[in-house]
Amino acid sequence: MKKIIIYIFASLFFASSSISGITFWTTEVQPARMAKQQDMAKDFESKTGISVEVIPVEEKDLGKRATAAAAAGDLPDVIYHTLQYVLPWAEAGIL
């Protein structure tokens, strides 16, 4: 058991050390919410050394943008979205 735990932590360490940046799409595009997300991204970067690019996406455009990005092989690392997208995106292989 101890060997498994050590292996898991070592894997996580080496996986995270190769990440230089994260792309984050958010539908929380209101100025106050964007400012808070930017602050959280800066805090995360200061603690991990991993930069976060916060990209606002209007909720009405999210489905089309995600589908196009998936087709182009250029999805972001993280998408903040509503539950309505979970099943169709899972079926399409986006999630």
Where are these regions (language model features)?
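Conserved N-terminal structural module of periplasmic/extracytoplasmic solute-binding proteins
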Residues: 4-7, 17-94
